[in-house]
Amino acid sequence: IPLSENPGFAKANNLALQQATGEFILFLNPDTIVAEDTFRQCISFFEQQYDVASVGVQMIDGSGTFLPESKRAFPSAAAAFFKLSGIAALFPHSPVFARYNLGHLSLDEIHRVDVLSGAFMMVRKTVLDITGGFDEAFFMYGEDIDLSYRLSKTKKNGTAYANYYLGTV
């Protein structure tokens, strides 16, 4: 989509979302390299689980290091305190002290999580139709937390939807 200016991550993705017609919508950063069968595995998970709002995958950086933003809890004052004070780093696998990055959850398994990264977030279109896309008040950063929150609060025909981290992908 040609744009004369940078409208920000949220607005740019929402412009694309307006033109999207697929059953699943993938928000993907342009510098992301995706393994060959990633999309197939994600779609298969959607088809097997009726309550999936969105899926994210195990993201790694160029040096092979796991990116903790792949799976997160909703931010809180306690999580910020534990991170800024260094307590989370002292106890990286604690469900209390390392709650924000969900350090107690295995990297290589499937988990229901609060927040997925906007760098790779595949979303069921029917759920996006209810929640709307990204909040354009966010120019960059935080918009994935907001959308993850709204997706996790969505209900339709008695189904409560959830966000899933696919550590196997």
Regions found by a protein language model. Give the residues of each.
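Glycine-rich, basic loop-to-helix element that forms the pyrophosphate-binding segment
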Residues: 2-20
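Hydrophobic/aromatic residue at the end of a short beta strand that borders the catalytic acidic motif
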Residues: 9, 28, 33-38, 61, ...
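Generic structural signal for small/hydrophobic residues in well-ordered secondary structure
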Residues: 16, 29-30, 55, 64, ...
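Residue-level recognition of short loop/turn positions
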Residues: 21, 31, 63, 126-127, ...
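Short aromatic/hydrophobic "clamp" motif used to bind/position activated sugar donors
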Residues: 25
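Conserved donor NDP-sugar-binding/catalytic core segment of glycosyltransferases
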Residues: 33-70
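Short, flexible, basic/aromatic active-site loop/helix in glycosyltransferases
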Residues: 74-113
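A short, conserved alpha-helix in the catalytic core of glycosyltransferases
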Residues: 106-168
